[in-house]
Amino acid sequence: MKNEKITSRSEDFASWYTDVVKAAHLAEYSNVKGFIIFEPNGYAIWEKIQSVMDGMFKELGHQNVYLPVMIPENLLKKEGELVEGFAPEVAWVTSGGSNSLEERLAFRPTSESLFSDYYKNVVKTYRDLPKLYNQWCNVIRWEKETRPFLRSREFLWQEGHTVHATSEEAEEETLRMLNTYKRFFEEYLAIPVVVGKKTEKEKFAGAEYTLTVEALMQNGICLQSATSHYFGQKFAKAYDVKFVNKDNKFEYCYQTSWGSTTRMIGALIMVHGDDKGLVLPPKIAPKQVCIVPIKMTDELLNVCNNLNDELHKNNITSYIDTSDKSAGFKFAEAEVNGIPVRIEVGPRDLENNKVTLVRRDTSEKELVNTNEVLNNVQRLLTDIQDSLYNKALENTKNRTYDAKTLKDVEEIMNTRPGFVNAHWCGDLDCELKMKEIKGTKSRCIVETKDYKDEVCVVCGKKAKHKVVWGIQY
């Protein structure tokens, strides 16, 4: 049954998204435009994401640090491409208390300048390398158009910054982190992704190249979900980050950075959500099971407590809804919040030592013996995780197209948008021409080679790259 507080996806996808954010108590608007309040349900998802990703990073040898939120203007401006790329989005502090500052301070839009300046002071010889650091923090970028989780003026993220003795090692790190993100999205968020290299126009300001993770939402709109950048020696030369190598000579370091944000929560909503609300993959759900006593009797509560204890002992996150609301309200609340499995404990079923299990993704119900709840819940959680991924993969496959001409691209984007595979000559003019079709942009280059017969989708000249194109959030 459709949740009356939520606009249907078919009616208005954008309104549906906003309704789910509110109905599931993920976030609220603040009194400053573009800034949101993370409510407990939303922040709990971010905490779960943090926990899993942090463990993955540490397995690879990364350590967490924290650098200041303020960046002196002169420091930010040292790398010209970086400041040029972020200048329109930087928020500045010009006074402290009642005193004007001698130099403006930028709220960090990203921290390459701070990390480079830090590495300049702590890296002396090749023995100090590599440094593999990550920080969890907030960032401020003065976006023109904002939407909760997808584009906010303040967002939470992790940004990894590493420094190496060789280009080979730094490039290996860039690729390693891209693959780490891909694994996280597919294994934990149950979101299939496409990975590749950004074009020169779309790469991170100051990077030699950018690798990207791209996901497709239910409505065929693309979401850049994580990026990994190789800087070469650009930042090292700008910030004088040098080390004494094994030949006892000074050499500039090689750097990378990589990041992902609370935008992932938006991806979860738009990839898995339905007209009832949020649908969370079990591996990332803060609460995997909701236990609902149909009546608040001692007998039913005793069974609920026993089930809750058994699930907890087996590392399944569950809770009992003991609120004074009706059972129907509790069911609907668990649904809108995306709890993967619901256990309904009622007096009639209990007479036969049975309870009802309900899976969130399909609403299918099954009656099981009370002594078989654990095994069945474990089975359901695994199956839901796999089913959500496969459903999202099916949507991605059904919305992935091949295009040979601009007319093909226009027809796709105007009817049923998605990922469009099309060859490209590499010229900026052709990339800009694609943008005239409903804002279509290159998502990533997935192949570069000496093509014999393939031609550019725009100009018809010999192609250099195979590119995935799409309309983005």
Feature locations, PLM:
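NTP/phosphate- and nucleic-acid-binding module
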Residues: 1-473
